[in-house]
Design a protein with these regions (language model features):
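N-terminal loops that bind phosphate or other acidic moieties
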Residues: 1-281
Length: 281
């Protein structure tokens, strides 16, 4: 079996395992609301509804629609707004949260438009507001927000080259988060100063929150040097689009700031937890 087929088979097994997780039950265990107090035990969050401004639910990933549907059922009229982004064919009916679909694993224009819609939703929230971010496998490819001047075509080409070379999900996400603006803590930054609680269903062995869906609400533990090392490992230095090379090289030189680390003050208003994963499924 060649490496590309082995990688594809591994992803199929991961997808099957994630599908076997009782997504709604995982969310129901993790978000509890009695009409007065909101409890989110995995993230050690508890607050009276009267102490929260807007409650916004965001769900991104292949399990996003089921997660969003359960969250809106739990919250009822306490839900102020929401947004769901999932893979084509994975959507389902929700009461109040709009559902968008986009391509996976190679990003497309629908993912780009959805990312802009999501950013607009969380921009302007206050410190009294709460964002509940529900993350699942596939979120990295779906949430497409390339850093200028990188365009969608360049991002698609880079993803295609890495996949064809046999890069694993960890390697792919290290590169992605250094080329985009909502990964590597970028979503938490966009939502600031609102409080953020991120709940993830993991498709990554070891459950690293900064790797699952490229860590949109998590501090980053990788660097531009790590991203470039992935490119070099697969001999892609001369094949990548010039805008991608320029972005990574600028990061190596320090002319682009590094992604925020876990101890960055940005994450003082963020809590996160894995609520289901492959071993427990």
């Amino acid at each position: 079996m060649d490496l590309q087929r082995a990688t594809a088979l591994t992803r199929e097994l991961f997808d099957a395992a994630i599908a076997a997780v009782d997504v709604r039950a995982a969310v129901a265990r993790s978000i509890q609301f009695d009409g007065d107090t909101l409890f989110i035990p995995p993230a050690a969050f508890a607050c009276r509804r009267s102490e929260i401004g807007r409650i916004v639910v965001i769900a991104v990933g292949k399990a996003a629609a089921a997660m969003a549907a359960e969250a809106e059922t739990i919250l009822g009229d306490a839900l102020s707004a929401g947004f769901c982004l999932t893979k084509y064919g994975h959507g389902e009916a929700t009461r109040a949260i709009p559902v968008r679909e986009a391509a996976h694993p190679t990003p497309d224009a629908a993912g780009l438009a959805a990312a802009a819609e999501l950013r607009a939703l969380v921009t302007g929230l206050t410190e009294d507001d709460l964002v509940i971010c529900l993350i699942s496998g596939g979120g990295s490819a779906l949430l497409t927000a390339p850093a200028a001047p990188i365009g969608l075509d360049e991002l698609r080409a880079t993803t295609g080259l890495l996949l064809a070379a046999g890069a694993n999900i960890n390697e792919l996400n290290v590169v992605r988060k250094h080329l985009e603006t909502l990964k590597g803590g970028g979503l938490a930054r966009a939502a600031a100063p609102a409080r953020v609680v991120a709940l993830a269903i993991s498709d990554v062995l070891g459950d690293p929150l900064d790797v699952i869906a490229s860590g949109p609400c998590s501090g980053n533990t990788s660097s531009f040097a790590d991203a470039w090392a992935v490119i070099a490992r697969y001999g892609l230095e001369q094949q990548l689009p010039t805008t991608v090379i320029a972005q990574l090289q600028a990061g190596l030189r320090g002319t682009i700031p590094p992604l925020p680390r876990p101890d960055d003050p940005l994450f003082a208003h963020v809590s996160a937890a894995v609520i289901a994963n492959l071993p427990r499924s």
